[in-house]
Amino acid sequence: WEITLKDQSKHRFKSLILTCPFPQLKKLAKDYLDKKITNLKIRMEPNITVMVAFNNQKNIPISSIKFNDDVLAWAANENSKKRFKSNINLWTLQATLKWSKKTINKYKVDNSIMNKLILRFIKLTGFKKNKIIFKRIHGWKYSYNYKKTPFLSVWNKRYNLGCCGDWFNGPKLEDAWLSANDLAKKIG
């Protein structure tokens, strides 16, 4: 395999492992994959997530909150993780699937999308609107696949090409690990 980077430098590899979402995998590797893979009917769903840090708010003794809301699906309290020792409150906010679908192509240019998620979080929790010292939004156009495929991963020995990712098995992080582990076993 020969990979050309943005700076036009070329690098050669004996094997290639792709961990990209299905629509991108299909474009990159369709000539090297079996039709039973490229003909899969995979529907990838979008996701919009905001990271926000509030200054000096009381420590909140919960790890996450699930909302019954049209915009905000859940919030994770990053301070509840033992690896963090912080005097600021760190939160990860995740939009609903419906709202993510509606805003995925606009979030990079429309700051109101990030601000709406943050204000919704404040309204739904009743937390004080303390000074926000950090906020960042990111969206994944191809974030989730809720339907399992017949495969956990793919290894094409002829081309030394491997493919793995959470979308093979489901929407969770553990599905990505299961897929990668399965591919590692196939490679040997």
Segments (PLM) and residue ranges:
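Central helical "cap/lid" subdomain
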Residues: K10-S63, F127
